[in-house]
Every structure is written in C-alpha cells, then in structure tokens.
C-alpha cells in the first residue's frame, strides 16, 4: 500500500514521512523535498529557527531547525530531542532493537533510508547489498527485501520503486513493516 497522492491520500503509520514518490520512511529521501505528510521537514521546523518549537515523536532538532534522526540531526549543533547523549538502539544502547523493524544506524538511531539501513546498520531492515535479479542468476532477496533495478537488496524507493525486480516492490515491504509493528514494538 502506498501513501500520499500515490496511495489515495493514505498517511504513514507512526508519523513516518510519506516521500514524494509515495513511500513511508524517515530521512532525507522521505522527509525532505516533496514530502507529502508525516514528520516532513518543511512542515516540522524546530529550535531557534521556529521560536523554540520541539520536534514530534522524540525526533532530534538539527542545527538548521529541521526534525529527524541520524548524525546530521542528533549530532553537532543539535537543539533538542535525543541529541547524541540519548542513544536509541544497537551497541550504543545495550543491543536494543528499533520498533517496527526500523533500521538501527551505525550511530545508534532508528530510521529508514540509506543513512540508517546502509553501511554500518546494526539491526532492523538493513540493506544487504547482495547481488540479486537477472544479473545474479535470478537470485531473490531474503526477508521480502526488494531487488533494485541495479541488482542490490534493500528497502525504500531506491530499491522498491521503478525498476524493482522482485520482493516487496511498490511499497509492499513498508506495508509489512506497519502490519508487524505490534510484534516488534518495545
């Protein structure tokens, strides 16, 4: 199931952002330019740039006044939320898992997108970057991950959008995450 304009106006669960392409997640690909609903940066300004407003859902307020997770929000210059000292997952939090099968970044924050699910991802729906698809003998990805048009496994628009070869293409994986959220919640 898609979100936003592509999903008949549907909103993402847990205040995740709906990207310009109609997929749910967190990070720049989802909450930045073109974000349709959820914790969009354009609509969720914070800190000194927004009269001291705080971010919803315990997100960090970056030095530039945008809400989100990861080093660019919770690191140097962070104005509010779980700034560096309040780690949420992974080895920085005693092996704690993220809710809803979100990825735990190398910095110990929960979210979706390459900054969370890519290199250094500790747990959750991490991108495996294993070869798949027609150039890998028809290999499919595990855990219903999407096989991108370039032949790598992962989730998000870059994997499950246009050209997706197999797995949870067109946002089916995001729907599965939302469906299983009660099983994975803290």
Curated annotation (Swiss-Prot):
Residues reported in the UniProt entry to bind substrate: 10-12, 62-73, 114-115
Gene3D superfamilies: Endochitinase-like
Glycan-modified residues: 180
Residues the record lists as Pyrrolidone carboxylic acid modifications: 1
Molecular function (Gene Ontology), one example: carbohydrate binding
Covalent S-S links between cysteines: 3-18, 12-24, 17-31, 35-40, 46-61, 55-67, 60-74, 78-83, 89-104, 98-110, 103-117, 121-126, 132-147, 141-153, 146-160, 164-169
Top-rank taxon: Eukaryota
UniProt entry keywords in alphabetical sequence: Chitin-binding, Disulfide bond, Glycoprotein, Lectin, Pyrrolidone carboxylic acid, Repeat
Extra facts: The 4 sites proposed for binding to carbohydrates (N-acetyl-D-glucosamine) of receptor molecules are on the surface of the agglutinin molecule.
Purpose of the protein: N-acetyl-D-glucosamine / N-acetyl-D-neuraminic acid binding lectin.
Complex formation: Homodimer, u-shaped.
Name listed for the protein in its UniProt record: Agglutinin isolectin 3
Species the sequence originates in: Triticum aestivum (Wheat)
């Amino acid at each position: 199931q898609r979100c936003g304009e592509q999903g008949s106006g549907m909103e993402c669960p847990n205040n995740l952002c709906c990207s310009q392409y109609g997929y749910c997640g967190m990070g720049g690909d989802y909450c930045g330019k073109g974000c349709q609903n959820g914790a969009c940066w354009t609509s969720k300004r914070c800190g000194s740039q927004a009269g001291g407003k705080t971010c919803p859902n315990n997100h960090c307020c970056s030095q530039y006044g945008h809400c989100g997770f990861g080093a660019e929000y919770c690191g140097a210059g962070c104005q509010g939320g779980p700034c560096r000292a309040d780690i949420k997952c992974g080895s920085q939090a005693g092996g704690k898992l993220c809710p809803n099968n979100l990825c735990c970044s190398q910095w110990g924050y929960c979210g979706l997108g390459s900054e969370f699910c890519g290199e250094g991802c500790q747990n959750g729906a991490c991108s495996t970057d294993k070869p798949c698809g027609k150039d890998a003998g028809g290999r499919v990805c595990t855990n219903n991950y999407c096989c991108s048009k370039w032949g790598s496994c992962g989730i998000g628009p870059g994997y499950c959008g246009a050209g997706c070869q197999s797995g949870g293409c067109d946002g089916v994986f995001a729907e599965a995450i939302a469906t299983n959220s009660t099983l994975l919640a803290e």
